[in-house]
Amino acid sequence: MLYFAYGSNLNLFQMKRRCKDSVFLKKYELKGYRLNFRSKYRAADIEKNKNSLVPGALFEISKSDEKKLDVYEDYPILYKKLYFTYYNKTVMTYIMVNKTEFRYPTERY
């Protein structure tokens, strides 16, 4: 399956450690969304915005990798899944369930 990574999941070392089967495919800009930081964790999120884009990357991931990401992203409590199409292929990413106010990102970003 295709996965769109943004925020801290762009760290290739971290992705490979967490998702052993993951394969980086390419840089990708998700149009019609913008990057935001929310929640008490000051974690990355994306939200619709027709004039913006989110820098990220496309990865091929296994079902096992998806399950590991679900745990890491606290799915479905903190994040839910968003699907979009890229060249007739379905791509999955995560967006926050509760859209809290903007918070400055953590140092690791």
Language-model region placement:
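Glycine-aromatic micro-motifs
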Residues: M1-Y109
